[in-house]
């Protein structure tokens, strides 16, 4: 399995990629290393973390696969949407460090019930999202969704596709210390579409509830880090 938030990484002759969770086995590895010369595969020693409800194997939604992974040139960093911690791994995953990266806007993740969840739950419950590495400023950006509300007339599945109603970005330094966490205005930006460039971080403002939204144009706003 490889998605835009879990891109394969090639280091010399080895390709590191992610694999789908298997709920029915005891040890459920997240990643696999593939030797590009011999085509041999090796599952890496890092399992999908447990979370409230993960013991239920037959379910409507599978939260295990909700995560992102980035590579900073030395380490892989995993951000599971249901976990306040991030996981920092060496390429071979023989060393895994768990680091608390908790939002200041909510105390704990509010997971939808795996069997009875409704689309609205995915719009209003608090949890985390993707993590990006910024090599130009040597910082990391972790998206967090605080508890929210669903406005009258808003279709929940459409809102989810555009990054929900609001969000914050937890900014981490190269040692994973929190530098700040700005909260962004309602219905303005789409945090699922972000670009890191030498001049700054670009976040799409093509949110369908933004008054300036144009279905024919994908637009961005540039943000720069400023020391306080």
For each of these PLM feature ranges, what is it?
Residues 13, 17-27, 143-163, 206-220:
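Short, conserved, GDST-rich strand-edge loop motifs in beta-rich repeat architectures
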Residues 25-40, 84, 88, 156-177, ...:
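Beta-propeller blade signature
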Residues 1, 41-62, 97-123, 182-188, ...:
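Surface-exposed loop and turn segments in beta-propeller and other repeat-based domains
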Residues 13-14, 29, 95, 114:
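Coil residues (strongly favoring Ser/Thr
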Residues 1-12, 59-73, 79, 124-137, ...:
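Structural signature of eukaryotic scaffold interfaces centered on beta-propeller domains
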Residues 15, 76, 140-142, 201:
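Hydrophobic beta-strand positions that form the internal "hydrophobic ladder"
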Residues 24-93:
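Loop-centered beta-sheet repeat module
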Residues 123-174, 179:
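Loop/turn-rich, solvent-exposed surfaces of beta-rich toroidal or solenoidal domains
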